[in-house]
A protein has these predicted regions:
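Generic, low-specificity signal for short hydrophobic/alpha-helical stretches with a mild N-terminal bias
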Residues: 3, 15, 27, 167-169
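Bacterial N-terminal signal peptides that target proteins for export
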Residues: 1-8
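Exposed beta-sheet edge and beta->alpha loop/turn motif
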Residues: 87-229
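N-terminal intrinsically disordered, low-complexity tails enriched in polar/charged
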Residues: 15, 21-22, 229
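Bacterial N-terminal signal peptides
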Residues: 9-17
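Intrinsically disordered, low-complexity regions enriched in acidic/Ser/Thr/Pro/Gln residues
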Residues: 59-62
Length: 229
């Protein structure tokens, strides 16, 4: 067997090794998780799961593993949406205050009116302006809701991404590009409380800092446990 053939076989063996190591990352992760759980090792648990869940189990087994889903990393878009809603909200503050002031002034005119006719006219005007103010206020509340939701969603995605990357704070992570890998694993556990079924949501982030060209290869993490039983 010549040197060229040996080199080719060596490459194939290395590739097979890495494939075998990475083909079932969920099993390795869950073995480590339940091992730490049995030892009450909260420190280790907190490095593997974003929201560690205490599961009382003497044994467990994997029932099903979903297909791996790959999606683009969208934190940059989420950050843009958050900033857009923030600007809309800030621009609407003045509009809301102006509508309130106009209504307040009309109510004041109604209180100062001396004749019944003047009071009726002022009240009719105040009622009309109150309806307009309520409409503007509802718009403002909707903008506030949209901003709060966009802000919370971006913050959550940033938290999950940095947890997977295991790099602590990354000030420019919202400008990163890359891919998000997702899996769902169904397991069955048995313990003193009986049999329980859980769905475990896994994530992994592989990102690139466009400013520096540095690649960040995240690890598989447990996003959350869902009790199915």
């Amino acid at each position: 067997m010549d040197r060229k053939t040996l080199s080719l076989l060596a490459v194939i063996l290395v590739l097979c090794f890495f494939c075998s190591c990475s083909s079932h990352p969920e099993e390795t992760l869950l073995k480590r998780y339940f091992s730490a759980l049995s030892l009450n090792d909260n420190t280790t648990l907190s490095t593997m799961a974003l929201e560690p869940t205490d599961i009382s189990a003497e044994s467990w087994e994997v029932l099903n593993v979903s297909e791996e889903v790959v999606e683009p990393f969208k934190l940059s878009d989420m950050n843009k949406a958050e900033l857009d809603f923030k600007k809309q909200l800030e621009d609407h503050v003045g509009i809301t205050l102006d509508a309130r002031d106009v209504w307040d002034n009309t109510v004041y005119e109604e209180e100062r009116a001396r004749t019944r006719a003047a009071k009726r006219a002022a009240k009719a005007k105040a009622d009309e302006l109150k309806v307009k103010y309520d409409e503007v206020l509802d718009e403002h509340k909707e903008l506030q809701k949209n901003y709060n939701e966009a802000k919370a969603a971006a913050a959550k995605e940033e938290e999950i991404a940095t947890f997977s990357l295991g790099a602590g704070e990354l000030p420019t992570v919202r400008d990163f590009t890359g891919e998000v890998f997702k899996k769902e694993v169904d397991i069955k556990t048995e313990g003193e409380a009986g049999v329980s079924n859980y769905r475990i949501y896994l994530r992994r982030y592989i990102l690139r800092d466009e400013a520096t060209g540095i690649h960040h290869r995240g690890r598989w993490i447990i996003l959350k446990f869902e009790n199915l039983s």
